[in-house]
Amino acid sequence: MVGIGSAATRAHLPALRAAEVGGSVSVVGVCDPDRDRRDAVAARHPYAAAFAENDEMLAATTPHLLVIATPPSAHLEEMAAALERGVHVLCEKPLGISDADVARLRDLAGRHPELALATVQQYRHATPWQWVSRAAVGGVRAGEPFTVRVGVERPGTDPLSAGGWRADPEHEGGILGDHAVHYLALLHLLDPHCAVVACRREGPGGREVASVDVRLGAAGMARVRASYAGTRRTNAVHLDRPAQCLDVDWEDGAFRLVHDGRPSATREVPSMSDRRVVNALYSPMYADLIAHLDDASWRSTATARTIGVAALLAAAIRMAR
């Protein structure tokens, strides 16, 4: 693993440690410029050595997989270093924020088609999203008019983050690369051919507000609105399929639907505004990756999804400028 900031310590490493205890993986190296941080992590993993440089770690440990959890502007070089050595990659989002970044991703994937270039897209493992997805994908397949509305509100950037990259929209992606990209990834799962048709962004770094409009299927539309200028932490997803008289709402820890005018009882569900819930989703993400990394078809699909989502994000950022 390269990068031992908040994402690594709160989510990646606990999930990897559980997999290590279960015997399905061994953490063989950790890399970070902070000596105390890397040594402390290495001490908790029986087979791990600590390194200050990624190239040195890759050469010394010859891993099967490199997990990248550094700031976004470092991702492409670290991915390239791994792929050139025949190492699969799992990289934190975002993988790129420009059309040039996407072109380089395509080039890397094209030169190493046997390797996985996967992204951390753990939201798809949330059970409430799987319920929304089953309802929404029918609209895509049927070519129905339908809408998906997403709202994410935060009172500023993550105060637990080890760095300030989230407040740097020009170089690191800002709120589009931090929050909106999670939902672009979910929309891409609904329709791999979806397309960004509009994006607006305003406000200074760290207090941004952005909205992204995405076309889904023949007649579906989604809007993802994300704000760092909020007063609370909240996540909401709303699906409306008029042809089926179906409305689905997932707002924080509450899930409800209305079908043919009949409302269901509200169900208590995991909330994506709860950091503990988001962090816990890394475990099923890693279980899926570990179980399928030897499957060439899975690797190809993961890489295609990575590039598709990166292209959506790059299009949104380009339109917002």
Protein language model regions, located:
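N-terminal Rossmann-like dinucleotide-binding module
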Residues: 1-45
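Hydrophobic residues in well-ordered beta-strands that form the structural core
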Residues: 91, 117-119, 248
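Contiguous beta-strand/loop segments that form the cofactor/metal-binding neighborhood of enzyme cores
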Residues: 178, 184-254, 283-295
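Active-site loop of classical SDR/Rossmann-like NAD(P)-dependent oxidoreductases
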Residues: 7, 33-36, 273-287
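Predominantly a Rossmann-like dinucleotide-binding segment in NAD(P)-dependent oxidoreductases
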Residues: 123-197
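Rossmann-fold dehydrogenase core element
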Residues: 103-123, 144-150
